[in-house]
């Protein structure tokens, strides 16, 4: 999307595909991925990127939403379940995605900020990836006093095995 909008060079597509292949294979190095994938945000505020993010979600994200996923989300919503999005994706995209899908909260890879408002191309550790995602979800559970409650987690990634092993109802899609 960013390359098509001439926001980043076309050459990023090939590099992005290599990172996606590494993610799918379980070999992604998140620090390197962060430096690459966050280049668009570097030096910008949330207000600076708002319009681009809204277009991305309307033109790219929403058409990609799987009807199976929407049905599952709706099922949990109808059961008055609390919906927490846990994703390795950066916090900016996760915030938009959680809002668009009707989630109550989200856990995502955090971006280092300058002066608390200006994004960089660096991620905070731990990222919400592999064991780091489990660590962040456990922290969220503790902070929200959610301990001992039934939990479901849906994933299509080998990178989520730690969290799938942790929840009461793991669902590999």
Regions found by a protein language model. Name each.
Residues 3-75:
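A metal-dependent, Asp-based hydrolase signature
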Residues 51-54, 58-173:
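C-terminal cap/substrate-recognition subdomain and adjoining C-terminal extension
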């Amino acid at each position: 999307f960013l390359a098509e909008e001439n926001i980043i060079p076309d050459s990023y597509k090939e590099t992005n595909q290599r990172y996606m292949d590494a993610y799918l294979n379980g070999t992604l190095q998140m620090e390197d991925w962060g430096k690459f994938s966050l280049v668009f945000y570097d030096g910008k505020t949330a207000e600076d990127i708002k319009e681009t993010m809204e277009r991305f979600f309307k033109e790219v994200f929403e058409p990609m939403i799987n009807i199976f996923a929407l049905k599952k989300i709706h099922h949990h919503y109808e059961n008055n379940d609390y919906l927490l999005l846990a994703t390795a994706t950066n916090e900016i995209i996760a915030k938009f995605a959680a809002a668009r899908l009707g989630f109550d909260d989200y856990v995502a890879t955090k971006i280092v900020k300058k002066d608390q408002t200006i994004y960089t191309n660096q991620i905070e550790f731990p990222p919400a990836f592999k064991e780091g995602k489990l660590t962040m979800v456990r922290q969220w559970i503790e902070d929200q006093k959610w301990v001992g409650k039934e939990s479901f987690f849906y994933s299509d990634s080998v990178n989520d095995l730690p969290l799938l092993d942790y929840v009461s109802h793991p669902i590999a899609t």
